[in-house]
């Protein structure tokens, strides 16, 4: 068994408290932060419109607005499409609206939207 697989197996067996302590220890040991990077500021509306066309958006966020009547199917679709664990997918579906995936290509965003809508969710691409 590879070292990576051994570490993954150990992490799978840890409690949430132990995982939190692990993250803190890694932050201290390696001098990094596990916090998500701050989003880039959006350009001001009504800016330079002097004949220059706005650049076409290349990264999209897929936002789940409502899980609908088939919440379990939506959670399963989110879990399968994102690789999240069941607990994370359920937490996402409980705190709506919430981004399912961020900064993905238009094609990936459309595929994800279609899968979640087929399961009964209300999805928006931003």
Swiss-Prot record:
Disulfide bonds: none
CDD domains attached to this UniProt entry: Ribosomal_L7_L12
Low complexity composition bias: residue spans: 36-55
GO-annotated biological processes: translation
Signal peptide residues on this chain, from the entry's feature table: none
Region: Disordered, residue numbers: 36-57
Record's keyword terms, sorted: Ribonucleoprotein, Ribosomal protein
InterPro entries: Ribosomal_bL12 (IPR000206), Ribosomal_bL12_C (IPR013823), Ribosomal_bL12_C/ClpS-like (IPR014719), Ribosomal_bL12_oligo (IPR008932), Ribosomal_bL12_oligo_N_sf (IPR036235)
GO molecular function, one term: mRNA binding
Pfam short name (any one): Ribosomal_L12_N
GO CC terms: cytosolic large ribosomal subunit
Function: Forms part of the ribosomal stalk which helps the ribosome interact with GTP-bound translation factors. Is thus essential for accurate translation.
Family: Belongs to the bacterial ribosomal protein bL12 family.
Subunit structure: Homodimer. Part of the ribosomal stalk of the 50S ribosomal subunit. Forms a multimeric L10(L12)X complex, where L10 forms an elongated spine to which 2 to 4 L12 dimers bind in a sequential fashion. Binds GTP-bound translation factors.
Name of protein: Large ribosomal subunit protein bL12
Record organism: Natranaerobius thermophilus (strain ATCC BAA-1301 / DSM 18059 / JW/NM-WN-LF)
């Amino acid at each position: 068994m590879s070292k990576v697989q051994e570490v993954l197996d150990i992490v799978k067996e840890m409690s949430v408290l132990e995982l939190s302590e692990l993250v803190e220890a890694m932050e201290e040991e390696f001098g990094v932060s596990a916090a998500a990077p701050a989003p880039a500021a959006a350009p001001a509306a009504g800016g330079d419109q002097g004949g220059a066309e706005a650049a076409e958006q290349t990264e999209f966020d897929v936002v789940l607005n409502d899980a609908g009547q088939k919440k379990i199917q939506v959670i399963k679709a989110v879990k399968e499409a994102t690789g999240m664990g069941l607990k994370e997918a359920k937490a996402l579906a409980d705190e709506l609206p919430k981004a399912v995936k961020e900064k993905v290509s238009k094609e990936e965003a459309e595929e994800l939207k279609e899968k979640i809508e087929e399961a009964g969710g209300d999805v928006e691409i931003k």
